[in-house]
Amino acid sequence: FLPVLAGIAAKVVPALFCKITKKC
């Protein structure tokens, strides 16, 4: 369960960071 969450977070967090800061 945790490894799955970590995998999702690893993909979602950079995408959110990209959208918020507009630094991709």
UniProtKB/Swiss-Prot annotation:
Enumerate the transmembrane spans: none
GO BP annotations, alphabetical order:
defense response to bacterium; killing of cells of another organism
Where in or outside the cell is it found?
Secreted
Q: List the disulfide bonds.
A: 18-24
In terms of InterPro entries, this protein maps to: Antimicrobial_frog_1
Question: In which tissues has expression of this protein been reported?
Answer: Expressed by the skin glands.
Q: Which keywords describe this protein according to UniProt?
A: Amphibian defense peptide, Antibiotic, Antimicrobial, Cytolysis, Disulfide bond, Hemolysis, Secreted
- Please tell me one Gene Ontology term that the record gives under cellular component: extracellular region
Q: Which family does it belong to?
A: Belongs to the frog skin active peptide (FSAP) family. Brevinin subfamily.
Q: What does this protein do?
A: Shows antibacterial activity against representative Gram-negative and Gram-positive bacterial species, and a very high hemolytic activity.
Protein name per UniProt: Brevinin-1
Which organism does this sequence originate in? Pelophylax porosus brevipodus (Nagoya Daruma pond frog)
